[in-house]
């Protein structure tokens, strides 16, 4: 599915992490794919309220939880900078799809990082 939201389609997700050699590109690519799948799901299912959005972001957050082992295997981790950038990406997505009242912490409440 192609992302139709222009703001999202043009956004460089996780760019500051790609610019830091500490974070392996191949794992970041998987994280970026998680974010894009979330966007595709939002466009396909069109959540009607914050509760529905939070259910969607919970699944995407759990996918990031699973990536932690891959970061560690590559000598990296989801540390403070990465946590902030990933959280910001979730918040950006919520805003881009019209959820101005989304709580940044609630968007990633299922995080283990």
What label would you give each PLM region?
Residues 30-37, 56-59, 63-66, 85, ...:
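Charged, amphipathic alpha-helical oligomerization/scaffolding segments
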Residues 1-44:
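Short terminal alpha-helical segments
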Residues 72-113:
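Amphipathic alpha-helical binding modules
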Residues 25-32, 47-50, 54-57, 80:
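Alpha-solenoid helical-repeat scaffolds
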């Amino acid at each position: 599915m192609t992302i139709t939201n222009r703001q999202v389609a043009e956004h460089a997700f996780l760019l500051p992490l790609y610019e830091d050699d500490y974070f392996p590109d191949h794992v970041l690519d998987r994280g970026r794919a998680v974010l894009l799948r979330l966007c595709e799901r939002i466009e396909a299912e069109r959540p009607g309220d914050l509760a529905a959005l939070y259910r969607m972001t919970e699944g995407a957050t759990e996918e990031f939880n699973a990536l932690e082992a891959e970061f560690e295997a590559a000598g990296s981790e989801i540390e403070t900078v990465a946590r902030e950038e990933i959280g910001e990406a979730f918040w950006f997505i919520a805003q881009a799809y019209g959820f101005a009242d989304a709580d940044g912490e609630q968007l990633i409440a299922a995080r283990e990082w």
